[in-house]
Amino acid sequence: MSEKDELMAEAFAHLEAGDPETALEIGKRLESLQYSGAYEVQAMAYADMDDTEQAVAVLEAGVAHAPGVWLLWQLLGNYRSDLGRFDAAIEAYEAAGNCAPDEDLVIVDFNHANALARQGDLALAQARLDRTLESPHLAQAGRAFIENAIALRMHLFVAQGEPKAAIATYEALAKQEHDEEGSNVSMADVLAELSLAYKQSGDNAKALATALDAVQSYKWSDAALWALRAARDEQSETARAMHLIVEGQWYEPLEDEDPDGPAPEFVTTYDVVAEDEAEALRLIAECEPPQVRESLRIAETHLIDNEDASATAYKGVYATGDYHMYQPGEEDESLDD
């Protein structure tokens, strides 16, 4: 493995470990070696540090330096889309499509379709997504990618008032035979779109049950949390927005730490709109594994000062933090609010 390849692998390992600062330093070393991957690493590091503007600036420099590297164009499109610059994002995807290998066009087309959907060009998004789903290279992109593409197709059907088509799309996915496991992350988004389709078709019971399944699949999915709030469709002028620190007992030992030891305790955070702490805890419990629900307790509650939003928002969970595990008697890690 060359020095550049080793540095790239090291940088991605730091990104995966939640250390974008070190990854950024490595990216700058790669830039001094005149390697185009430097721009990819630096941009991803800036994005992980919530500086998407700087990520875009780095990538714009990158595509000027290496205009034939499709990965840089695609990443530039993704970050421009995140900033709401959809026309510029689409230009980047078109440039990526002009230099990407045939087997990678399926990914470019998917991201292109997603930007069009975000922009509200639903018909164009559907046409671009059709290119993804009809590609001969779709299977090699992996099951999780296919699930993401199906979630987007279902989203487009729901957005155009076609819930039956969305439900049929899910049923076709469920019937597909496949050797590879998908992803609980992508499946949460699929189930979220299915819940919204049931809601739109008037089947409130299925909408709620499916939204609960989506949250159990991956509770950090914004789509799943939204589907659950939409399925309940509850608003109250007296509900309050709250940031809560929640503690509980995990249900099994941590295999990577002490597989034969006791199950750890945990602390996490939730942003919830509810009448009071008791209702907030009930809503939180639905997002947690059934085995831990009885152990849940609220350690701290901080009211979010946004009266206007609380009065009009749907009740439910809006965000949840990571788990911080610790053994009883140990000092738990501090949480970032």
Where are these regions (language model features)?
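Start-of-helix register in tetratricopeptide repeats
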Residues: 5, 37-40, 70-71, 105-107, ...
